[in-house]
């Protein structure tokens, strides 16, 4: 092929008026039409492997077919994709890409990146290409234009290592509170996409099964309400859950008749609107019967209250995020290690609930706006046998305004530095009739060599220098 490409490019250069600048390739999923000039630049001048290039584009479309539940199987006409191809053509000098009935059109500046295989080039064209293919694959009875077609684009983007385009920050902002702050029709495209995508996160075959139901049953809704009801009905069937509560959380209203029909499915209290793409391929056990060792500290300013969360590092890969409850009502959800309440008052009580990626929850921690803070220099200290140890050297105490009240900390310690072993130091701080407790582990080892063999791990301290022991072999 390269020999023919070089010869044709030479002919094109010598006689451009009578030679068509045309290049095509055909795979089992794509009929691609572009220019000889771009093909020459990519395959000859830049040395991109032709087979890798064509396979790359073909695999994007094949993955879209797979995501839709399509397969080459003539015995299953509703889901058969035998001999079905996507036509992609160079069609316009401006814009980026578009979808029409029988083809996806791209522009000239877009073309070379389509043929390249490096990650940067792929990232520059992948979303737009699969977005347009999604328009072609969208089923009218189920399509929300510029939203549902992005199910294919988002899937492709994530699978290729690019970002998830769902705007979870605003989904949490609008939906986490007891009463949703915004409904589906008021959301932007990428927030609306979340309503569909989070069901895919709940069950990774959701979209394929949903598409199959639409192809098989061929519904024809008479109005927008029927369209919404059909989506809720089919989605509930696929997940085997009465999803009334989920769609209503999104402000995606269902008819009374639809709600009644959905009562035949099992109910659920899972907060699916907390899911994000970090749960994909998660196989952990979550937080059932697990001590997350969640610690919450509170700091207060004149205008807000900031909650800072810390969890057992051994289960951080299981963590989805934290639900924030204020005075008995949910006010937010965050995947960050802190949350700021900008509508705080002096008498508020907070609860923080850790959520695992399978939506199981750990023990909640309660804290009030008057709770003092205990700041440990580190969670674990290692000492040599016989070494001096003062438990108060590793802790400080503060009011919720940040005033130092370390002198009020009470220490309960069973540490015996004359005997090897693992010990616990418990710190208790009471201020304004509110008590806070924290613990630190102390390990006493036998000699210098044993201690020097300990491997350092990344450690965070609020103050001071983390240490195994300040007196042994220069370790500080």
Language-model features, listed with the residues they occupy:
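C-terminal edge beta-strand
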Residues: 365, 369-372, 436-446
């Amino acid at each position: 092929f390269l020999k023919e490409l070089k010869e044709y490019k030479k002919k094109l250069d010598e006689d451009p008026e009578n030679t068509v600048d045309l290049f095509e390739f055909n795979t089992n999923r794509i009929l691609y039409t572009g220019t000889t000039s771009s093909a020459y630049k990519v395959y000859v001048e830049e040395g991109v492997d032709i087979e890798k290039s064509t396979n790359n584009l073909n695999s994007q479309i094949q993955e879209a077919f797979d995501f839709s539940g399509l397969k080459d199987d003539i015995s299953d006409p509703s889901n058969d994709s035998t001999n079905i191809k996507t036509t992609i053509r160079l069609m316009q000098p401006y814009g980026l890409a578009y979808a029409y009935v029988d083809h996806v059109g791209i522009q000239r500046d877009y073309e070379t990146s389509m043929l390249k295989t490096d990650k940067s080039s792929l990232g520059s064209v992948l979303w737009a290409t699969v977005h347009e293919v999604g328009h072609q694959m969208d089923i009218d009875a189920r399509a929300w234009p510029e939203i549902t077609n992005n199910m294919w684009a988002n899937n492709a983007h994530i699978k290729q290592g690019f970002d998830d385009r769902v705007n979870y920050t605003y989904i949490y902002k609008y939906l986490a509170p007891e009463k949703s702050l915004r409904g589906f029709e008021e959301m932007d495209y990428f927030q609306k996409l979340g309503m569909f995508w989070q069901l895919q996160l709940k069950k990774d075959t959701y979209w394929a099964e949903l598409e199959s139901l639409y192809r098989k049953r061929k519904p024809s809704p008479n109005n927008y309400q029927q369209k919404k009801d059909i989506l809720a009905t089919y989605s509930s069937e696929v997940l085997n859950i009465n999803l009334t509560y989920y769609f209503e959380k999104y402000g995606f209203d269902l008819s009374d008749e639809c709600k009644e029909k959905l009562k035949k499915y099992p109910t659920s209290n899972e907060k699916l609107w907390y899911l994000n793409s970090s749960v994909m391929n998660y196989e952990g056990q979550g937080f059932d019967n697990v001590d997350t060792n969640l610690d919450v500290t509170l700091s207060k300013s004149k205008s807000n209250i900031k909650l800072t969360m810390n969890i057992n590092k051994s289960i951080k890969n299981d963590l989805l995020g934290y639900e924030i409850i204020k005075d008995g009502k949910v006010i937010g959800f965050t995947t960050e290690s802190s949350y700021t309440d900008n509508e705080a008052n002096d008498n508020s009580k907070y609860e923080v609930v850790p959520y695992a990626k399978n939506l199981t929850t750990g023990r909640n921690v309660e804290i009030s706006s008057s709770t003092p803070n205990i700041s440990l220099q580190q969670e674990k200290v290692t000492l040599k046998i016989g070494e001096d140890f003062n438990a108060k050297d590793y802790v400080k105490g503060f009011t919720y305004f940040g005033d130092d009240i370390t002198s009020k900390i009470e220490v309960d310690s069973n540490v015996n530095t004359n005997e090897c072993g693992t010990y616990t130091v418990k710190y208790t701080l009471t201020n304004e009739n509110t008590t806070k407790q924290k613990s630190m582990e102390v390990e006493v080892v036998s000699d210098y060599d044993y201690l020097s063999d300990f491997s350092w791990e990344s450690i965070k301290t609020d103050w001071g220098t983390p240490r195994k022991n300040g007196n042994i072999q220069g370790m500080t």
